[in-house]
């Protein structure tokens, strides 16, 4: 069957530009290689077509055919025949199959099947119901790479390998036609095919092509089964294949029938939006944390590497350091980080067998692939021997144990959080409170830059609230704002403030800023990271202890330990006791303690209580991760992040699908807590900020820098439009599967990226001012090698240019960014480039200029990319041709659909995994759509002076989008002090007892019950968000956005709100719905109920 049969124009198959249903978009850094489903017409579809054909022949209302036959009778006869044929096919493929039959579908033509050398199974080169052939599907999912052809096939029993070096990785292999002879030579992509001096001058390396194209083996190598063969074969879906592959890991002899057995592939319970109590919360999140832990353990323990060569060295602290290189892998699965624990074993016979544990102190970078580990103890280490070592990755459960412990503490310990935060986090409706505090006269902190109007508003509001969300779009001074908030909280004198973030880099950046204010800051890091240098090492707890003058005995013991390497047992005991005392003293006297979210579970903090807690980058942390610091006594909690950028990393797809990939920040937004958005960006040239602002932030970003500020002196680069430092460079290359089998690369794009980088360097840019980013690890790895071997300038220059994945670049910036899109195919889709949050991150890293290299034909099929390409074309920066003579591309694109939902902007970029039908169907919940009533017009005419919200008619009824009602109602007068209750809504739906304490575990079962017929209205958030702010300015123009076409926000036939979906989103974001996202948006919605036969607003 030809590949063309599967094209978009095919009438036989329906193309769905989607990833697998179970591969969630929110799993932002999971596997990059996904399989797009094709759907063969099912039996019912075929029958439906037959019926419609007959209907077309029916003449008149009586359903009589022209020849007088009864139409119904004729149809029944045809259907019976169709069913009979299907039965025949069933029996054909349930009979005994030969050993070499495809393990998925049963096709057994020797010319069509390939043997997987690793799994010892046969697979065909047909696609069936999936986009990739069955053999490629298996190789990718099982992470296998070596194959053998069938002995009765046209090429005989052949193991596919490189002619030059013997490499058997089929994802690396390709062929070169020999010029003289009618033969082809198999060579690996790197290094053999890229070598300038190939063995035989008849080989033209420029003709090299991969053996796997369009996700199947080339048809001359392995025949593709005919359409008839594939139709008669066992039909298997991508989802079944995925489950079968998982089953094979446990039981290699499992079959499709085993999938039907009870207990196989049980799905975990899905996360909820609201929880009855903390026990239910723990019972849902605990199993998800365990799933992720088990997956992580299996992944780490499967990474054993043999035959490692070690280079030994001695560190300044007298500890042994082992340097080694691991075999090249670009799978992206193994994320080796500084501080990780590694076990090194000697397996040879030149010295006694030995085993040592060490911590990673250096990871591969552009300068080299070497890894360095510092050994805990060097006793018996065979330092004279370099060869025959084995590396094992030691899995540590610490992070997951601390998450589980936090979930338990939240459930059983009354003092872990305040009553208000307890109920807010569980989604209970409680009265909003204002904290009575002395506001500073000047909000800017000493040692930090002056704040702009939106930053001042954020600081002022946060200080008065027990729970706040701050949304910081790219370059809006999120770190400065957070540091200023921490400064004012610390000045209030309520004990140390705890500051956390998911990553060590984010913690270090914030620690540095807070230190500039003059506060006493302690950076608490894991003991495994104490040897790792960072910009704030001098603030680290272990280093501050070294410099304590108040404990001379500790200093003497420390000096002795440094000189000798070890202490006697009695001295060691005394040293540890003194060290613990010093640590406690430093921590208790600190103004601010900074650590990672998981680091907050450190035993050294166990006895401490923190009234105020700030979590930066909270949208990149899973919810249990956020709970680790929260349960240390939070009475005032501030979450900072941006849900329009990439979310948490969840490796286990099952856990991600169940909602572990949802951040706490996002869930609270959905519950109706409006984030305070920072509005002035100081990073990007105004021309670079226009598109992200209009598409991702409803035009609310204002520019804190001018075009003149972003003109680089001594930089001579010819931009296609001198006033717009950006362009899209049209590249017509083809994507290839990378050597890991789980990622992609594009050689043509890599060559163009090198040319552009060289041009930027020649124009005066320094190497460290350029960042090259790509969504795919395969392309990142290929680019690093390509620049080294093929760059026309000195190798050292290219080494200093940072090449990273888009995900790794979040939170970073460079003067110039080159984005390589990689994807270029006829009908496979664009994979996880579909994720709009990834595009947002990619476009907002640059300060002075952005260059995108990609294939517009492939990208324009996705509506958001189509929007970007249209925008670049309108700006006359969609270009092609040689770099020294760029010309405008004549490529045409379809008119972009309207992407901005004026009713509920920005929400489409949030992955809402926590919604399920149970939540949506609860009568009276915020998603209750049982009524069609509309509020009177007075509730539509809202004016938010903070965000400059315009007024307009409300098409909510047709959009089927749930909006939390508390964002619509007029403001209540703010309470005067903590715990004060105002108005008739007092106590409605609030937990029993005072708001300041946890009160009862059970919610008020009267008006506050989810199951009640009458919805229960939370106190209005508007009281805190609709505060007058004279500094607010209007948004950037949105003139170029097409506004004419109506917004198609829900799929036809879907009535439940949790199934509504933005029209442009790919399948990765199915189940996305618009929800209230930010302070700068028009929040209008209906939440009516039937009362006494009259539809009206519920009592406020």
From Swiss-Prot:
Biological-process GO terms, alphabetical = chordate embryonic development; nuclear-transcribed mRNA catabolic process; nuclear-transcribed mRNA catabolic process, nonsense-mediated decay; positive regulation of nuclear-transcribed mRNA catabolic process, nonsense-mediated decay; regulation of gene expression; T cell differentiation in thymus
Keyword ATP-binding set for record: yes
- Residues annotated for Zn(2+) 3 binding in this entry: 162, 165, 188, 192
Task: Give the enzyme class.
Answer: hydrolase
Q: Where is the composition biased (Low complexity)?
A: 42-53, 982-993
Where, by residue number, does the polypeptide cross the bilayer? Answer: none
Start and end residues of each stretch annotated as C3H: 102-134
Q: Which UniProt keywords apply?
A: ATP-binding, Cytoplasm, Helicase, Hydrolase, Metal-binding, Methylation, Nonsense-mediated mRNA decay, Nucleotide-binding, Nucleus, RNA-binding, Zinc, Zinc-finger
Q: Where does Zn(2+) 1 bind?
A: 102, 105, 124, 134
Positions contributing to ATP binding: 455, 475-479, 645, 682, 813
Please provide an example of a Pfam family that matches this protein in its UniProt record.
Answer: AAA_12
**CC/SHH/C: where is this region?**
116-144
Q: What happens when the gene is disrupted?
A: Morpholino knockdown leads to both intermediate and severe phenotypes of abnormal embryonic development. Intermediate phenotypes show developmental delay, including aberrant formation of the head, tail, eye placodes and somites. Severe phenotypes show severe developmental arrest, including yolk extension defects, and lack of recognizable morphological development. High mortality rates of 80% to 85% at 5 days post-fertilization. Increase in premature stop codon containing slc24a5 mRNA transcript levels in melanocytes.
**Where in the sequence does UniProt note compositional bias of the Polar residues kind?**
1012-1063
Q: For binding Zn(2+) 2, which residues are annotated in this chain's numbering?
A: 116, 119, 138, 144
Q: InterPro entries per the record?
A: DNA2/NAM7-like, DNA2/NAM7-like_C, DNA2/NAM7_AAA_11, Helicase/UvrB_N, P-loop_NTPase, SF1_C_Upf1, UPF1_1B_dom, UPF1_CH/ZBD
| Disordered: annotated segments | 42-67, 978-1065
**UniProt family annotation:** Belongs to the DNA2/NAM7 helicase family.
Can you say what this protein is called? Regulator of nonsense transcripts 1
Report the source organism.
Answer: Danio rerio (Zebrafish)
